[in-house]
């Protein structure tokens, strides 16, 4: 009797694990991220947000290059010394503004990326719950999957609005 119960329990455990395998799905997060980013126009939003500062930096760079060219053609004297100091100060200001611009742009890009990831994760959870899926794995993290593993990428993309 004890062996029979043990065999029945083992059979039940194997059947449960085989049944759980049916509730696994994959999703292509890279593709989703790219498509959702295009759909929402995140890159255009960021570009418009930083357009003014980028054009100011370009103007500063052009002005600085013109002054450096003028400085190279000048002979030694008080005007040259004054222009050298001006160029050095402008170069330092430009470097500081460029660094601040890059940091702000990277910070905003990360914020927008985080928002997209949150939206995608919420959609993945919603689709997984509606389709009774227990485990969703990124398709790029899977070394092999058989053809019977469900790909919910299209369903998730529809869910993300």
Curated annotation (Swiss-Prot):
It is found in: Periplasm. One of its GO terms (cellular component) is outer membrane-bounded periplasmic space. Coiled coil: none annotated. Molecular chaperone that interacts specifically with outer membrane proteins, thus maintaining the solubility of early folding intermediates during passage through the periplasm. Required for the efficient release of OmpA from the inner membrane, the maintenance of its solubility in the periplasm, and, in association with lipopolysaccharide (LPS), for the efficient folding and insertion of OmpA into the outer membrane. Gene3D superfamilies: Skp domain (3.30.910.20). PANTHER family: CHAPERONE PROTEIN SKP (PTHR35089:SF1). SMART domains: OmpH (SM00935). It comes from Escherichia coli (strain K12). Residues 1-20 form the signal peptide. GO terms for biological process: chaperone-mediated protein folding; Gram-negative-bacterium-type cell outer membrane assembly; protein folding; protein insertion into membrane from inner side; protein maturation; protein stabilization. Residues 97-108 are annotated as: Lipopolysaccharide binding. This is Chaperone protein Skp. It comes from the Bacteria. Keywords: Chaperone, Periplasm, Signal. The keyword Cell membrane does not apply. Homotrimer. Interacts with OmpA. Interacts with PhoE during its translocation across the inner membrane, but, in contrast to OmpA, release of PhoE from the inner membrane is not dependent on skp. Also interacts with LamB, OmpC and OmpF. One of its GO terms (molecular function) is unfolded protein binding.
């Amino acid at each position: 009797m004890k062996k029979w119960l043990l065999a029945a329990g083992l059979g039940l455990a194997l059947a449960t694990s085989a049944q759980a395998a049916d509730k696994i799905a994959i999703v292509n997060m890279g593709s989703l991220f790219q498509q959702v980013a295009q759909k929402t126009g995140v890159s255009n939003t960021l570009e418009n947000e930083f357009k003014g500062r980028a054009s100011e930096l370009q103007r500063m760079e052009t002005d600085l290059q013109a002054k450096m060219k003028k400085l190279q053609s000048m002979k030694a004297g008080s005007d040259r010394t004054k222009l050298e100091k001006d160029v050095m100060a402008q170069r330092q200001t430009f470097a500081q503004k460029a660094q601040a611009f890059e940091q702000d742009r990277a910070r905003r890009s990360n914020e927008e990326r985080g928002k997209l990831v949150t939206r995608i994760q919420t959609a993945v959870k919603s689709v997984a719950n509606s389709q009774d899926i227990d485990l969703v794995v990124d398709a790029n993290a899977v070394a092999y999957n058989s053809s019977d593993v469900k790909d919910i990428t299209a369903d998730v993309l529809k869910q993300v609005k």
